[in-house]
Amino acid sequence: MGDHAWSFLKDFLAGGVAAAVSKTAVAPIERVKLLLQVQHASKQISAEKQYKGIIDCVVRIPKEQGFLSFWRGNLANVIRYFPTQALNFAFKDKYKQLFLGGVDRHKQFWRYFAGNLASGGAAGATSLCFVYPLDFARTRLAADVGKGAAQREFHGLGDCIIKIFKSDGLRGLYQGFNVSVQGIIIYRAAYFGVYDTAKGMLPDPKNVHIFVSWMIAQSVTAVAGLVSYPFDTVRRRMMMQSGRKGADIMYTGTVDCWRKIAKDEGAKAFFKGAWSNVLRGMGGAFVLVLYDEIKKYV
């Protein structure tokens, strides 16, 4: 094995451990966020049983479903990391060459900006093609509020994928795919635009203290996450459609989903669980910083 391949494998495995630790640590926040996002589209949660907010959700989950249910869907989320990273690594440079070859960042800023969006969107869409069923299963497992085996809609990752595939075919596992790609592009546009602006405002962008860099990254991630959050809400709601038939189908398509959420629930509904998303990002970053510190002594 060459040095390059060995280096990639080490980073890949170390990153996988870090991802597993950080995702597992913030999984309860992630589940709260997902439940707040999709409860209106859930057959299991009637109007009177809907969660009133983050605190209500955190208090009721262990009471109604057991403490370990905070980690429902986490395995799919951890597994998803490995193919996503491998695919990103495989496609990233190819898309950069295609969209950014010969573009000067300083002299052709807007072309560079557009190329960055295109390469990020293309790389994201390519890896999503392969890992989307895992993301789908993670959402459906997290949204499953049944307590015992008899009340659960799905009994695990494999059961979820098989049931939906039998019911709706491959299309059922890719509900909300289009809006997911749109969300990636919007996220990258916000992230790239805000990050560059923030760094450009510093007196010496090349010599920035690690804490300042971390604060900028946190702020930019939070802003980009909020800007693209409505797309995430719509895609999760679309995921909840799979396996439904006839009158049970709430949304006829993505456009109908946008329209009905705005009309029936108001614009605020697009941002349900957004605050927990910000907390999750901070928690994940903290765990990764901790992991880097531990790695120094191992």
Swiss-Prot record:
Assigned GO CC terms: membrane; mitochondrial inner membrane; mitochondrial membrane; mitochondrial permeability transition pore complex; mitochondrion; plasma membrane
Keywords: Acetylation, Antiport, Cardiomyopathy, Disease variant, Host-virus interaction, Membrane, Methylation, Mitochondrion, Mitochondrion inner membrane, Phosphoprotein, Primary mitochondrial disease, Progressive external ophthalmoplegia, Repeat, S-nitrosylation, Transmembrane, Transmembrane helix, Transport
Annotated region described as Important for transport activity, given as residue ranges: 235-240
Biological processes, Gene Ontology terms: adaptive thermogenesis; ADP transport; apoptotic mitochondrial changes; generation of precursor metabolites and energy; mitochondrial ADP transmembrane transport; mitochondrial ATP transmembrane transport; mitochondrial genome maintenance; negative regulation of mitochondrial outer membrane permeabilization involved in apoptotic signaling pathway
PTM characteristics: Under cell death induction, transglutaminated by TGM2. Transglutamination leads to formation of covalent cross-links between a glutamine and the epsilon-amino group of a lysine residue, forming polymers.
N6,N6,N6-trimethyllysine modification, residue list: K52
Effect in UniProt of substituting D104G: In PEOA2; decreased function in ADP transport
Reported tissue expression: Expressed in erythrocytes (at protein level).
Residues recorded as bearing S-nitrosocysteine in the entry: C160
Chain sites annotated for binding ADP: R80, K92, R235
UniProt note on regulation of activity: The matrix-open state (m-state) is inhibited by the membrane-permeable bongkrekic acid (BKA). The cytoplasmic-open state (c-state) is inhibited by the membrane-impermeable toxic inhibitor carboxyatractyloside (CATR). Proton transporter activity is inhibited by ADP:ATP antiporter activity.
UniProt keyword Repeat present: yes
Compartments it resides in: Mitochondrion inner membrane; Membrane
Bilayer topology term: Multi-pass membrane protein
Outcome of swapping A90D: In PEOA2; decreased function in ADP transport
Reaction equation(s) it catalyzes: ADP(in) + ATP(out) = ADP(out) + ATP(in); H(+)(in) = H(+)(out)
Residues on Mitochondrial matrix side: 38-74, 131-178, 232-273
N-acetylglycine: modified positions: G2
Purpose of the protein: ADP:ATP antiporter that mediates import of ADP into the mitochondrial matrix for ATP synthesis, and export of ATP out to fuel the cell. Cycles between the cytoplasmic-open state (c-state) and the matrix-open state (m-state): operates by the alternating access mechanism with a single substrate-binding site intermittently exposed to either the cytosolic (c-state) or matrix (m-state) side of the inner mitochondrial membrane. In addition to its ADP:ATP antiporter activity, also involved in mitochondrial uncoupling and mitochondrial permeability transition pore (mPTP) activity.
Subunit (UniProt): Monomer. Found in a complex with ARL2, ARL2BP and SLC25A4/ANT1. Interacts with ARL2BP. Interacts with ARHGAP11B, thereby inhibiting the mitochondrial permeability transition pore (mPTP). Interacts with TIMM44; leading to inhibit the presequence translocase TIMM23, thereby promoting stabilization of PINK1. (Microbial infection) Interacts with HIV-1 Vpr.
Similarity annotation: Belongs to the mitochondrial carrier (TC 2.A.29) family.
Medical condition linked: Progressive external ophthalmoplegia with mitochondrial DNA deletions, autosomal dominant, 2: A disorder characterized by progressive weakness of ocular muscles and levator muscle of the upper eyelid. In a minority of cases, it is associated with skeletal myopathy, which predominantly involves axial or proximal muscles and which causes abnormal fatigability and even permanent muscle weakness. Ragged-red fibers and atrophy are found on muscle biopsy. A large proportion of chronic ophthalmoplegias are associated with other symptoms, leading to a multisystemic pattern of this disease. Mitochondrial DNA depletion syndrome 12B, cardiomyopathic type: An autosomal recessive mitochondrial disorder characterized by childhood onset of slowly progressive hypertrophic cardiomyopathy and generalized skeletal myopathy resulting in exercise intolerance and, in some patients, muscle weakness and atrophy. Skeletal muscle biopsy shows ragged red fibers, mtDNA depletion, and accumulation of abnormal mitochondria.
Alphabetical list of PANTHER family matching this protein: ADP,ATP CARRIER PROTEIN 1-RELATED-RELATED (PTHR45635), ADP_ATP TRANSLOCASE 1 (PTHR45635:SF32)
Domains: entry comment: The transmembrane helices are not perpendicular to the plane of the membrane, but cross the membrane at an angle. Odd-numbered transmembrane helices exhibit a sharp kink, due to the presence of a conserved proline residue.
Protein name as catalogued: ADP/ATP translocase 1
Lineage per the UniProt record: Eukaryota, Metazoa, Chordata, Craniata, Vertebrata
